[in-house]
Swiss-Prot record:
Pfam families: Ribosomal_S14. GO terms for cellular component: cytoplasm; small ribosomal subunit. PANTHER family: 30S RIBOSOMAL PROTEIN S14 (PTHR19836), SMALL RIBOSOMAL SUBUNIT PROTEIN US14M (PTHR19836:SF19). It comes from Mycoplasma pneumoniae (strain ATCC 29342 / M129 / Subtype 1). This is Small ribosomal subunit protein uS14. The keyword Calcium does not apply. Belongs to the universal ribosomal protein uS14 family. Zinc-binding uS14 subfamily. Binds 16S rRNA, required for the assembly of 30S particles and may also be responsible for determining the conformation of the 16S rRNA at the A site. Its cofactor is Zn(2+). SUPFAM superfamilies: Glucocorticoid receptor-like (DNA-binding domain). Keywords: Metal-binding, Ribonucleoprotein, Ribosomal protein, RNA-binding, rRNA-binding, Zinc. One of its GO terms (biological process) is translation. Binds 1 zinc ion per subunit. Zn(2+) binds at C24, C27, C40, C43.
Length: 61
């Protein structure tokens, strides 16, 4: 889990555009965020297994 201060810091608009970065909406993780879904890979996996993300299922071939 991310620190509360980092979550608050993310909500502010940065002075320079290159300083902006994505953060998981669910847990606050800054790395491995899937921008299409807005969550990190770990939360995405949990939500996909739970069936909370429509159209996503476990691949098997």
């Amino acid at each position: 889990m991310a620190k509360k201060s980092l979550k608050v810091k993310q909500t502010r608009i940065p002075k320079f555009a290159v300083r902006a970065y994505t953060r998981c909406q669910r847990c606050g993780r800054a790395r491995a965020v899937l921008s299409h879904f807005g969550v990190c890979r770990l939360c995405f996996r949990e939500l996909a297994y739970a069936g909370a993300i429509p159209g996503v299922k476990k691949a098997s071939w």
